[in-house]
């Protein structure tokens, strides 16, 4: 029997079809599941937006998806759906192993970088031509910086030798001080006389270290002292040899920038070959 009857207090009779009732219940359950699934995907998108990283591994993506309640068997379909909608960049079929196992959670940043590098407003320039042009620019900059690099290496060696010599002189002073105190204690004088002298020498060493820390705002360590002595001597040699420090630093920054752009162009070429 596929129906039942309900009689109300006024004697009116109403017949309900159980088949229709069951079907509507099933539809409702399906709609609820769809809504819950969409809510989980929405939570996943929010988590990815809040994540400061612009690139994560697919395993990290799976971990975040599981945190919001998405089941293991649904993760692949969810990732593909998000990739198709443009919410993420995921290339599981890429020939590049790094791209294949990575998820770019901030696709807008990638698109902006590509637009900036490729200069999309100037149409008609191929990626390979851009790469060759970028390599030519880098080679030109390296030729400009080479004589400065050679000159700087000579200056750096001199500055390093001076810093090392001063540090070894300090060590020699410590040994000489210990030898003189030993001589005065056991041969010329006695410990009763040398004790206050050694106390003030120790206190003076601590005072020198504290003064160094106060003046330079750096710890009184071997690394800090060596770096400071090296930098001081290097600056003096730069001035003495008329070394264009500013030009050199600008060239270094320009080369670094061009090399980063070249890497991004080469990555874009690999991406282009997979599509």
Swiss-Prot record:
Alphabetized GO MF terms: calcium channel activity; calcium ion binding; uniporter activity
GO BP of this protein: calcium import into the mitochondrion; mitochondrial calcium ion homeostasis
Record topology, Mitochondrial intermembrane segments: 187-192
Keyword Ion transport assigned: yes
Reaction equation(s) it catalyzes: Ca(2+)(in) = Ca(2+)(out)
Protein name: Calcium uniporter protein, mitochondrial
Function: Mitochondrial inner membrane calcium uniporter that mediates calcium uptake into mitochondria. Constitutes a pore-forming and calcium-conducting subunit. Mitochondrial calcium homeostasis plays key roles in cellular physiology and regulates cell bioenergetics, cytoplasmic calcium signals and activation of cell death pathways. Sufficient to operate as a pore-forming channel without the need of calcium-sensor or auxiliary subunit.
Coiled-coil residue spans: 125-157, 244-270
Localization, UniProt: Mitochondrion inner membrane
């Amino acid at each position: 029997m596929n129906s039942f009857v309900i009689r109300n207090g006024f004697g009116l009779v109403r017949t309900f079809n159980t088949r229709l009732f069951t079907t509507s219940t099933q539809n409702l359950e399906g709609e609820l599941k769809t809504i819950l699934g969409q809510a989980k995907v929405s939570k996943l998108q929010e988590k990815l937006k809040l994540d400061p990283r612009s690139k994560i591994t697919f395993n990290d993506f799976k971990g975040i998806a599981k945190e919001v309640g998405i089941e293991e068997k649904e993760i692949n379909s969810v990732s593909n759906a998000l990739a198709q909608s443009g919410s993420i960049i995921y290339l599981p079929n890429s020939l590049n192993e790094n791209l294949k196992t990575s998820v770019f959670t901030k696709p807008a940043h990638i698109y902006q970088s590509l637009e900036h590098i490729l200069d999309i407003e100037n149409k008609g320039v191929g990626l390979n031509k851009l790469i060759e042009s970028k390599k030519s620019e880098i080679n030109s900059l390296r030729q400009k910086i080479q004589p400065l690099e050679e000159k700087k290496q000579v200056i750096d060696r001199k500055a390093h030798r001076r810093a090392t010599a001063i540090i070894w002189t300090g060590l020699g002073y410590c040994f000489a001080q210990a030898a003189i105190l030993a001589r005065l204690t056991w041969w010329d004088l006695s410990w009763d006389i040398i004790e206050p002298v050694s106390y003030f020498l120790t206190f003076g060493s601590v005072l020198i270290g504290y003064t160094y820390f106060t003046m330079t705002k750096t710890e009184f360590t071997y690394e800090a002292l060596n770096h400071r002595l090296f930098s001081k001597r290097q600056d003096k040699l730069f001035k003495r040899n008329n070394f264009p420090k500013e030009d050199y630093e600008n060239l270094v920054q320009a080369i670094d920038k061009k090399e980063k752009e070249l890497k991004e162009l080469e990555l874009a070429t690999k991406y282009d070959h997979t599509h």
